[in-house]
Amino acid sequence: GAVFPVPEIQQAAFLPYILPLCRPSFLVLTGHDRADGTSSLHTQAFCRSVRAARLYEPDPERLVIFAGACSSRAEDILKAGANFASSPGRIPISVLDPVLLALAASAVSPGRRIEPSRIIAATLCGPAGIAAAPN
């Protein structure tokens, strides 16, 4: 897989150019976020990025998306179209959690359904740090 370090607020603009070139089956959109009262600093940027990725591939089975960071509003990111999001408990997640999630999801055989609870169990923070879209 390819890694492109793009600031959170620029990810949505970057995706239309890079997704057709890479044609990923799994996309990780992360960075930094922090709770600021009732909102989070970059949650809306992650939501815009998820919507941009869904314009490229609307099928959540063909493009699995993880988005968010520490203290992100997972419910907003899931509504935007992500399969997985952080952080439902508004906790700091491990820097390894997006990687562990991607590894666990990529280990699922093609044509088999990803079981969200099994994928989330593979992360360090578990359900307090990672949420899955409802089936």
PLM regions with names:
Residues 1-5, 28, 84-87:
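Short hydrophobic alpha-helical runs that function as membrane-insertion/retention elements
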Residues 1-6, 14-15, 19:
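Metallocofactor- and cofactor-centric catalytic cores in central/energy metabolism, strongly enriched
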Residues 13-14, 45, 49:
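Well-ordered alpha-helical segments embedded in enzymatic catalytic cores
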Residues 48-93:
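Catalytic cores of nucleophile-dependent amide-cleaving enzymes
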